[in-house]
Swiss-Prot record:
Protein name: tRNA uridine 5-carboxymethylaminomethyl modification enzyme MnmG
Matches recorded under Pfam families: GIDA, GIDA_C_1st, SAM_GIDA_C
MF terms in GO: flavin adenine dinucleotide binding
Record carries keyword NAD: yes
The organism's place on the tree of life at top rank: Bacteria
Compartments where located: Cytoplasm
Binding site for NAD(+): 272-286
Family note: Belongs to the MnmG family.
Main location: cytoplasm
UniProt organism field: Cereibacter sphaeroides (strain ATCC 17025 / ATH 2.4.3)
Key word Flavoprotein present: yes
């Protein structure tokens, strides 16, 4: 029977991108549908049981600042929390949590179920409904038609997905799930630039057959840092992970069987992630290394499965068993599921607007691995951006443009839509020019007010944020009103040149932890503020002078981002523009001068040609 249901926004896929997209759209007050093959699989962690890390933790904090789900789910499921780069400055520290898969999935499903305006629809999308260059809905395999004003596609690794284990290849979106073939074929009809990428996963081990006594054990932090600004402590029991390493015998077995690897046997055309190489890649690329670390990560408190982080592979199952059992502590281990590589379709993200809407198809948005990224966090951040923008478009409001100067989300989206990808893209702090101001600890200060203005932040977060900002403002005023001479600082045992310069207590906090502690003694009123507020004031003070310089650079970037380039701009008519640059500009169709400036091979003179034409057009429009 043919059924028709009406929604404002339809999200296809219930992975990390899809969950965030659907929830974000619903928080904006539109009616959203999340279409998934199995509702019980919403929020499944398909690969490693962990959230966050360097750069990735920043993305999770930014998602949380806009009232997204991932940070709260990770806090609910976290069984080991570690702040990476703890000995370095806050700008490059990254929160990370080992998660219980079952608890994470349960938390995500609970958040989605509790979200007003969101319906979960079970089914397989086999067709996109299009009308004169606009997405108008989807068709399900059972004949049900879902109409909508915007569609967000978050297909993960399911588009033409193929699983490889040695010479064996089979269709699959992930182990145990069929791929999406009809939808992949439909997308090919849109004439978008398509490619193939691959990712891999290690064998899963039975923790009861591991000799944990041979391993170095790694506990979590004694003072765990949460992902969500609303949470302050773990709720699940905390555990340790084990550390072991490969050895020469391991490497010998892998080398002797490279011809049986799907990757090295020529069965895979897709490019894999550079920063998450398979054990085959590690042994070929780093032939001089005698060992590679392997982190044994329990997948849950009530689950015996262990994820051996560091040995993803596409070798045959029997070879996997041989090399795994050469590793200390794993001599008698039982493999519960072999590792495998998965190859899938992605589409060139340069064919997207900065809102993640497909340039050639109004109302159609892409988010996650379909855009060439890898990682839960990257997918979730894109889902958030796409869901918010789809809802804004439905309501006839201006889109949300994340900037390189305000968020890691902005850095990622700009990288994708301006430069495209040649390999799976993952986030690092090194990708951000303004990383001193784009810290994980201040994501709420950067983004939550934007979320309040948009309408995607709920009352609980809004009230907590406004209370925090009021406390920070009072604390900063308090510190800036206390002026200290070099003599005062000497009494506080803060060494500084006796130059006669009076400094505010806030400026003195920038001298480091000891200075911050001394300032707290000198300004006893600070003790009235909560501990986390005092910590945040110290971090803000530490970077204040550097941020002032970066703000000048950010203002310059924002000026360039404000200069919009029409989508039909005629680059071919610019005399003096090289054929190579003309071709790149026509392909990329940058939305702003800032995006054009970041294209490979772009020159200052070429930018001036474009700016000159834009200014001339602006003057003509004003005169006419």
């Amino acid at each position: 029977m043919f059924h028709v249901k009406q929604f404002d926004v339809i999200v296809i896929g219930g992975g990390h991108a899809g969950c965030e997209a659907a929830a974000a759209a619903a928080r904006m007050g539109v009616r959203a549908a999340l279409v998934t093959l199995r509702p019980s699989d919403l929020g499944v962690m398909s690969c490693n049981p962990a959230i966050g890390g360097l750069g990735k933790g920043h993305l999770v904090r930014e998602i949380d600042a806009l009232d997204g789900l991932m940070g709260r789910a990770a806090d609910a499921a976290g069984i080991q929390f570690r702040l990476l780069n703890r000995k370095k400055g806050p700008a490059v520290q990254g929160p990370r949590a080992q998660a219980d898969r079952r608890l994470y999935r349960a938390a995500m499903q609970r958040f989605l179920l509790e979200q007003p305006g969101l319906d979960v629809v079970e089914g397989e999308v086999v067709d996109l409904l299009l009308d004169q260059g606009t997405a108008t809905g989807v068709l399900l395999a059972d004949g049900t038609r879902l109409d909508a004003k915007a569609v967000v596609l978050t297909s993960g690794t399911f588009l033409n997905g193929t699983i490889h284990i040695g010479h064996d290849r089979r269709p699959g979106g992930r182990m145990g799930d069929l791929p999406s073939i009809p939808l992949a074929q439909r997308l090919m009809d849109l004439n978008l630039s398509r490619g193939r990428l691959k990712t891999g996963t290690p064998p899963r081990l039975d923790g009861r057959t591991i000799d944990w006594t041979q391993l170095e054990m790694q506990p979590g932090d004694a003072d765990p840092v949460m992902f969500s600004f609303l949470n302050h402590a773990p709720v699940a029991r905390q555990i340790s992970c084990g550390i072991t390493s490969t050895n020469e015998r391991t490497h010998e077995i892998v080398r002797d069987n490279l011809h049986q690897s799907a990757m090295y046997g020529g069965h895979i055309e897709g490019v894999g992630p550079r920063y998450c190489p398979s054990i085959e890649d590690k042994i070929v690329r780093f032939a001089d290394k005698t060992g590679h670390q392997v982190f044994l990560e329990p997948e849950g408190l009530d689950d015996h499965t262990v994820y051996p982080n560091g040995i993803s592979t596409s070798l045959p199952a029997e070879v996997q068993e041989s090399y795994v059992r050469t590793i200390a502590g794993l001599e008698e281990v039982k493999i519960l599921q072999p590792g495998y590589a998965i190859e899938y379709d992605y589409f060139d993200p340069r064919e997207l607007r900065p809102t993640l809407e497909v340039k050639a198809m109004c109302g159609l948005y892409f988010a996650g691995q379909i855009n060439g990224t890898t990682g839960y966090e990257e997918a979730a951040a894109q889902g958030l951006a796409a869901g918010l923008n789809a809802a804004l478009a439905v309501r006839g409001r201006e889109p949300l443009h994340f900037s390189r100067s305000d968020s890691y989300i902005g850095v990622m989206i700009d990288d994708l839509t301006s430069r495209g990808v040649t390999e799976p893209y993952r986030m690092f702090t090194s990708r951000a020019e303004f990383r001193l101001s784009l810290r994980a600890d201040n994501a709420d200060q950067r983004l939550t007010q934007t979320g309040i203005d948009l309408g995607c932040v709920g009352p609980a977060r809004r009230d907590a944020f406004l209370t925090k900002m009021d406390s920070l403002s009072r604390g900063r005023t308090m510190l800036q009103q206390v002026m200290l001479t070099p003599t005062d600082l000497a009494r506080l045992e803060i060494r500084i040149s006796q130059d006669g310069t009076r400094r505010s207590a806030f400026d003195v906090m920038a001298f480091g932890e000891e200075a911050a502690s001394a300032v707290e003694r000198a300004v006893p009123e600070l003790a009235l503020l909560p501990h986390d507020i005092r910590q945040q004031l110290a971090r803000d003070a530490l970077y204040a002078q550097f941020i002032a310089r970066q703000e000048l650079e950010a203002q310059s970037l924002k000026r360039d981002e404000a200069v919009r380039i029409p989508s039909d701009f005629d680059y071919g008519s610019l005399s003096g523009l090289s054929h190579e640059l003309t071709a790149k500009l026509l392909h990329a169709r940058p939305a702003t001068i800032a995006q054009a400036a970041r294209l490979e091979g772009m020159t200052p003179s070429a930018l001036m040609l474009i700016l000159s034409r834009l200014r001339r057009a602006s003057r003509s429009a004003a005169a006419g």
